[in-house]
């Protein structure tokens, strides 16, 4: 015999509604409140190459790719199909310009780190100009509050928020 048979209807509805509310609160708490990515652009003028690494929340990227593909995407397993999908996303949302020339970045791959993914790109034989422009609008269409921190390193000097720091290794 069930305990619900002994409770008044009001209590049964209260318990049901309370349980539903708890489930909704729990499900809502799994979403994270901040949508932040980190992009690092490293330029070695002597080598004439540009290396880019981009860190994004894996669940956010999977959601974006899944909606685009119309099917579930799981980036925790590195496959050629995942590499291709991720490359297309990164190439469409991340641009690096040196001087007045947009640089074609080759997607090298990605790695998984806890709940994040690191994407790696590079360009070789790039003539360096003093002006570098980096535009990262990855996931802005997906999340209104998405933001990105961009670090630009040129010959061991890093530019962060209009200040120049010397990196010592």
What are these regions (language model features)?
Residues 2, 29-30:
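Polybasic/polar functional segments that serve as interface/processing modules
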Residues 1-12:
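N-terminal secretory signal peptides that target proteins for export/translocation
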Residues 31-169:
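N-terminal soluble domains immediately following signal/targeting peptides that reside
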Residues 13-27:
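Bacterial N-terminal signal peptides
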């Amino acid at each position: 015999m069930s305990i619900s048979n002994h409770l008044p209807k009001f209590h049964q509805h209260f318990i049901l509604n309370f349980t539903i509310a708890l489930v909704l609160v729990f499900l809502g708490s799994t979403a994270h409140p901040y949508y932040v990515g980190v992009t690092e652009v490293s330029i070695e003028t002597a080598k004439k190459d540009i290396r880019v690494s981009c860190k994004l929340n894996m669940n956010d990227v999977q959601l974006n790719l899944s909606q685009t593909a119309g099917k579930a995407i799981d980036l925790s397993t590195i496959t050629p199909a995942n590499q291709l999908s991720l490359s297309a996303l990164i190439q469409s949302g991340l641009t690096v310009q040196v001087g007045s020339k947009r640089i074609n970045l080759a997607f090298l791959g990605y790695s998984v780190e806890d709940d994040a993914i690191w994407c790696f790109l590079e360009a070789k034989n790039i003539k360096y100009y003093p002006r570098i422009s980096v535009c990262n609008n990855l996931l802005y269409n997906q999340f209104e509050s998405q933001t990105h921190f961009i670090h630009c390193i040129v010959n061991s000097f890093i530019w962060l928020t209009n200040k120049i720091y010397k990196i010592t290794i």
